[in-house]
Amino acid sequence: MDMATSNINGHGDRPSPAARFPTAPSVMTMNGNFASVGDAPTKEQYEHGIQVIDEQKEFNPNLNEYLQYTDTAHSGFNYHLISVFGSQSTGKSTLLNHLFGTQFGVMSERERRQTTKGIWMSKNKNQSSGASESETMADNILVMDVEGTDGRERGEDQDFERKSALFALATSEVLIVNIWEHQVGLYQGANMGLLKTVFEVNCQLFLKDKQSTPRSLLFFVIRDHLGTTPLANLKETLIQDLSAIWTSLSKPAGLENSKIEDYFDFAFAALPHKILQPDKFITEVQKLGTRFRAGRKSARAEDAGFEGGVFLPEYHRRIPADGFAVYTEGVWDQIVNNKDLDLPTQQELLAQFRCDEISREVLISFDAKIHPLEEKQGEDVRSGKPTVIADLGVTGKTARTSTIKHFETQASRYHKAVYTLKRTELEGKIDTRLKLLFHGQLLAAHKSGVASFSDAVSTAVKNGQKRAASYEFADIVEREKEVALKTFEAEMKSLYIEELSWTNFSSSYDLFEKDLNEVSGNLRKEEMRRLATHVERWVRSRLNDSIGVEFNKLGSGRGGSGAPETGEKPATEKDLWDRIWKTFTGTVKEAESKFIERAKSFDASEDEIEIGLWRLRRKSWGVLRAKIDEEVMEGNILLKLRENFEDKFRYDEAGVPRIWRPSDDIEGIYTKARESTLTLIPLLAKFKLLETSSPPELPEWIGNTPASVDPKDEEDLTPIGGVDEEEGKSLEEEMTVLSEAKRQDLVVRFKKTADGVYVEAKRSAIGGVAQVPLYFYGLLLALGWNEIVAVLRNPIYFVFLILCGVAGYVTYTLNLWGPIIRMLNAASTQGVEIGKEKLREFLKDSEVGRQALGMQGRDAGDSDAISLNTLDSRGKRVVREDEDVDEI
């Protein structure tokens, strides 16, 4: 024993633990410094590593947290996974600790028992094994230390051995097989049983996934190589044994003739004895570490099949690092429950899980940008005042692009079909919300645009009216319409997303333009109505003057004694209705020309102009008919008939006033004047033209109802007889000015008025017969001579007499005697009335008066004011409707 010991290092002592493995603890610790399954892990534990699966086959749920801590989770595909196999207590953990700087627990020199239970993982800590890039290890190498086989603790139970092998093969790129040189050529010692298990589970995987055919690298690390047997010979022996095992396997259908090289690549490395040659062992381990980097296949023998490193792209399982924990947990769940492991399905499930998770994450940022806009839009809609949100299109497009970009960056590394499906779903969710938001924005832009257009046109029209200047309505509409369309188009373009067909809002633009046309049409109709009202007012003003003048001409043709024997009326009376019709049609025609000229400036259609003219003619006829009815009202027509009669009775044919004498034929003149005036009543009773002796062609003049007329345009129109047949009123009735009853009543009243004039004339003729006798003047001179002389001698009386004479002459010259007499009569009558009123008040207020008349005193609250009464032309008191007449 002492000799053996002295041969170990040449000095008779074993190397110190630090020399054997500088990072491992001096005694077996069972990876106590790692984060085990069921523990509440700490950062210090994560510094060493994590137990992925414990000896009870429980998966560690904190694996993803460990990957986050080691900055591996966000590396995408830029990571590599290595698993180590080998018999128990053969130095697997020691190899990994030296090769990757890990701190897996190793076996104590004092004991020979199991140290690695379950599957452990640690990240490579020897990132730079050499100075140059070709000697630098790959980034993010994860190392799994798998529980050793042939352990006495498990005995014949090979269930965990098989499950762990299947797990490692499903997840790892490189499987390191740790064997001793003297075990090469053996079955159990060379781990051929374990490799057979690996091959069998590999066939199970390929049976489910024949299309992708993932490859793995079996990296044989031959320990304690003395050099007596060349590495090439050892390699050949191992490949022969592996091929024999592969041939003996029962392969799935379709794989009977497959070769082991179809599914596995092989790499070999030899390490010197760790204890006998510690320095050389460290050197070779460092050289071995440089092979763990990215590389590619090589046909040159000196490259050992690899150019560069051993991490070939086809070895990678293409599971993104952020989904590795979920994927491996799913794989282990399938394995531990003895289900057929379907890696493609697991990859799809992982992709679904991660894509959903990523989708939820990216939607959070999307929601942060979009939700406030949705809230504001919803509040505006609920308040009934939708508003256009500034920069909504830019915000929506930016949020959509960034959200999908982030999803693509993280999720595109997963199963392509699942990624494509989930991206479509994400786009659907985003686009659904954006669609509602964009449509709401366009609706608000639509409503606000229409309202702004209407307000702008109305404001421009009002400004034009205030300036009393002519304005072109069509130009205003066209200008404001162009502004509204440009604003809406700009908003529409801001919402356009090239790859989304539904953001092509051309139909919304067409609808907006259609609504603008409809609104402009309504505004034009309003302007046309305003124009029609203005023209109708102008027609009414003109007709009121001109028709009034025509009616005032009644009786202007002198009749009387100079009238023809036949009693025919002068031309000015016979053609009254012709003149009225001519004046009326001329006025309306002028109004029509003004209407057409102005309507064309509104860009009104032919139909609108036709309807406007039709309404104008009907309205104008209504104005004329109302004016005629006003002129032939009882008071007005009776006054005109009296004026006509007096004009013919009081004046001769030359227009000279008559001075009635007893010798004049008053009765004859009266009869002719009365009969001449009475003939006006039938003339005024019917609206008939002199030329045709029939009413004017009113229906033809008004015209037929336009086909495009709106029922609303007829609501304010008065029915016209002979035109509106459904009203049941004929043209004859429409042209009747005075009914038969009214005519008869008018004749009776006129005759009474004429009789009064005749009596007055008769009295004036008789009154002129009485004369003062001549002797009366002589008697007056004789008896009043003294007074005459006194007046003439007295300057005051004389001047007063002269002034009275001048005043009397002026009064006579100006014909003021009548008004003066009426004023005196009115004043005297008013004085009498006031006297009566004061007498009543005295009798009411006086105690003596009340006793005499048996009246009660009136209330103290009555007014003591004396009011002046309203008198008529004859000095009589006029009683107002709101005034009660006190009875004495």
Swiss-Prot record:
GO molecular function of the protein, one example? GTPase activity
Q: Where does GTP bind?
A: G86, S87, Q88, S89, T90, G91, K92, S93
InterPro entries in the record: G_GB1_RHD3_dom, P-loop_NTPase, RHD3/Sey1, Sey1/RHD3-like_3HB
Query: What is this enzyme's EC?
Result: 3.6.5.-
Here the segments flagged for biased composition (Acidic residues) are: 712-723
Q: What start-end ranges are recorded for coiled-coil regions in this protein?
A: 724-745
Topological domain spans for side Lumenal = 793-795
Q: Which SUPFAM superfamilies match?
A: P-loop containing nucleoside triphosphate hydrolases (SSF52540)
Residue numbers on the Cytoplasmic membrane side: 1-771, 817-888
**Location of the GB1/RHD3-type G domain:** 76-315
Identify the domain of life.
Eukaryota
Stated membrane topology is: Multi-pass membrane protein
Q: Which UniProt keywords apply?
A: Coiled coil, Endoplasmic reticulum, GTP-binding, Hydrolase, Membrane, Nucleotide-binding, Transmembrane, Transmembrane helix
Q: Which GO terms describe its cellular component?
A: endoplasmic reticulum; endoplasmic reticulum membrane
Q: Does the keyword Transport apply?
A: no
**Compartments (UniProt record):** Endoplasmic reticulum membrane
HAMAP family of this UniProt entry? Sey1
Under the heading PANTHER family, the entry gives:
PROTEIN SEY1 (PTHR45923:SF2)
Q: What does this protein do?
A: Cooperates with the reticulon proteins and tubule-shaping DP1 family proteins to generate and maintain the structure of the tubular endoplasmic reticulum network. Has GTPase activity, which is required for its function in ER organization.
Q: Which family does it belong to?
A: Belongs to the TRAFAC class dynamin-like GTPase superfamily. GB1/RHD3 GTPase family. RHD3 subfamily.
Query: What name does the UniProt record give this protein?
Result: Protein sey1
Q: What is the lineage of its organism?
A: Eukaryota, Fungi, Dikarya, Ascomycota, Pezizomycotina
Q: What gene codes for this chain? A: sey1
